A protein has these predicted regions:
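Flexible loop/coil segments at beta-strand boundaries within sensory signal-transduction domains
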Residues: 124-129, 139
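Amphipathic alpha-helical "output/dimerization" segments
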Residues: 144-161
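Regulatory sensory and allosteric helical modules in signal-transduction proteins
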Residues: 49-50, 56, 60-66, 70-116
Length: 174
């Protein structure tokens, strides 16, 4: 994995974090209707062109819900800003990505894609592991208020609740 961030993207609890993600057994599945609908609602709520529900695996970031990046189901972990968002239990916000030192070599920021704004709230398990993000992306710089941050966190909680319910159903059916 190539790291384009000029900083580590592996949390100290990486091994346990990946085990927590594996428990839910949803990493290899393609995007699904529930999470894609959630991504669309998030995009409309925040008036952004792209919203994603992502899971951060060992090598890739998988998009379980995708609005605005049609046909893209995964991105190399070393390029996805979601890799930075799982390092913390609080949201990660880049109001103007081009001004962030850790993003100056990231191809999504400096390349043709032109990412300028990113806000990602971690999807956190009951045990405290950040397994993915609910994030929004824009091509223009943008301020993000405290109220908006709280709403994004609520969307991440909803995503985690759905993942937990699916995990319970899957494990009870075995």
């Amino acid at each position: 994995m190539v790291n384009t961030f000029n900083k580590t993207i592996l949390p100290e609890n990486e091994v346990d974090r990946l085990k927590a993600l594996e428990y839910f057994d949803i990493l290899n599945a393609l995007p699904d209707r529930y999470f894609s609908n959630l991504a669309r609602i998030i995009a409309v709520t925040f008036d952004v062109p792209i919203a994603l529900v992502s899971l951060v695996g060992s090598e890739d970031v998988i998009f379980k819900g995708n609005f605005g990046m049609k046909g893209i189901n995964r991105v190399d972990r070393g390029k996805s800003l979601c890799s930075l968002a799982v390092l913390d239990l609080e949201p990660t916000i880049f109001a103007d990505a081009i001004k962030e030192p850790c993003l100056l070599t990231n191809p999504l920021v400096i390349g043709e894609f032109g990412l300028r704004f990113y806000a990602g709230a971690p999807i956190i398990t009951k045990e405290g592991f950040s397994i993915g993000t609910v994030c929004i992306v824009g091509k223009e710089p943008r301020e993000f208020s405290a109220d908006e941050t709280e709403i994004l966190k609520l969307f991440a909680e909803n995503a985690m609740h759905e993942i937990e319910m699916r995990g319970i159903i899957k494990h009870n059916s075995k």
